[in-house]
Amino acid sequence: MNIFEELKARGLVFQTTDEQALVKALTEGQVSYYTGYDPTADSLHLGHLVAILTSRRLQLAGHKPYALVGGATGLIGDPSFKDAERSLQTKETVLEWSDKIKGQLSTFLDFENGDNKAELVNNYDWFSQISFIDFLRDVGKYFTVNYMMSKDSVKKRIETGISYTEFAYQIMQGYDFYELNDKHNVTLQIGGSDQWGNMTAGTELLRKKADKTGHVMTVPLITDSTGKKFGKSEGNAVWLDADKTSPYEMYQFWLNVMDDDAVRFLKIFTFLSLDEIAEIETQFNAARHERLAQKTLAREVVTLVHGEEAYKQALNITEQLFAGNIKNLSANELKQGLSNVPNYHVQSIDNHNIVEILVAAKISPSKRQAREDVQNGAIYINGDRVQDLDYQLSNDDKIDDQLTVIRRGKKKYAVLTY
């Protein structure tokens, strides 16, 4: 099975320009290719991971990746399938975000070894050197307005309005391909399926300005089995930055993937072989309640993104919280595991009686209910049941001198901080 056949088998090929020519190029020698990442935030997220891992698969097959950070295009804003104009960021912000994204990409691509080691480029380096007049004369003349308006990404914005700034975005992305081909002999661009219009602007410019053929391959935008856009948890993006989405939160995200999606996601998001995945699928279908596919997915992706130690910590947090063993976890681990739990900051002047604290922290709705909860054995402090109405919180209840975990019943948690 050649690399293109494997990508197809994993569900990673959505659309290509001349497929036969692309397969020929990939099987006959080393291909230099690029994927672009606009710095629209200070971190990449799970939505970017499909293209990143596809790029890594091609590198493992001997091809040479260029990771393009869009320091210039990030200043403009991509209109593709957006309902409204993006807010423009300052140059300083975009350059800062660009540096952070460069650091994240080095986790996945090999920038050190071999003749196909990855290269980082930033399109701000060339766009900052081109005058507006030169750009119009040397690049703009190759694009008709009719051609630019025929793109689906633009059509959807015509009625609501699109600025010239965003309208010109596709020309800038097209010029990226031309520049990388001219300087580094890059002949293939990889990106999300929503980028098809912008990407083919590059092959068009190559053909007209340099009389060369370029290839484009898009990866699918991933949705779950209900058709919902994949990569968000509770409406929030799942970030690759551990400070924005903790390894534990990422682990839980993958653990909660639906049965109908789990095996498909193993093919897309892990480097397990297709034979290994087929074996997991057989075991998974025989005992779905054991969630083997989800557990494997969580292990593989968290290890890939954050490392083995982070995976082990996420697994330990999961197991200890499930067992109610709060005291077996550090304050930092509890902050990860209980990040979505209500917090109450205890002041030194507060009454530290258990009943008062339960009401103040909104664990129990009233003092009467709080007393009943304590007497009925429904209240736990750091995993230990408390039934004494006169119980006073003390330093002994602080984990690492930072927090106390209170549980009411089986599932209602609150974290007290000091």
Curated annotation (Swiss-Prot):
Q: What SUPFAM superfamilies does the entry give?
A: Alpha-L RNA-binding motif, Nucleotidylyl transferase
Q: Which residues bind L-tyrosine?
A: Y34, Y169, Q173
**Superkingdom of the organism of origin:** Bacteria
What is the main EC category here?
ligase
Q: Which GO terms describe its biological process?
A: tyrosyl-tRNA aminoacylation
List the PROSITE patterns hit by this protein, alphabetically: AA_TRNA_LIGASE_I, S4
Q: Tell me the ranges covered by the S4 RNA-binding domain, including all copies.
A: 352-418
Place the motif 'HIGH' region on the sequence. Answer: 39-48
Gene Ontology CC terms, in alphabetical order? cytosol
Q: Does the keyword tRNA processing apply?
A: no
Q: What is its EC number?
A: 6.1.1.1
InterPro entries named among the record's database cross-references: aa-tRNA-synth_I_CS, aa-tRNA-synth_Ic, Rossmann-like_a/b/a_fold, S4_RNA-bd, S4_RNA-bd_sf, SYY-like_C, Tyr-tRNA-ligase, Tyr-tRNA-ligase_bac-type
Q: What keywords are annotated for this sequence in UniProt?
A: Aminoacyl-tRNA synthetase, ATP-binding, Cytoplasm, Ligase, Nucleotide-binding, Protein biosynthesis, RNA-binding
Localisation per UniProt entry: Cytoplasm
Any GO molecular function? tyrosine-tRNA ligase activity
Q: Motif 'KMSKS' region: list the residue ranges.
A: 229-233
Q: Tell me the PANTHER family matching this sequence.
A: TYROSINE--TRNA LIGASE, MITOCHONDRIAL, TYROSYL-TRNA SYNTHETASE
HAMAP family per the UniProt record, alphabetical: Tyr_tRNA_synth_type1
What NCBIfam families is this protein classified in?
Answer: tyrS
Name of the featured protein: Tyrosine--tRNA ligase
Q: Which organism is it from?
A: Streptococcus pyogenes serotype M1
Q: Name the gene behind this protein.
A: tyrS
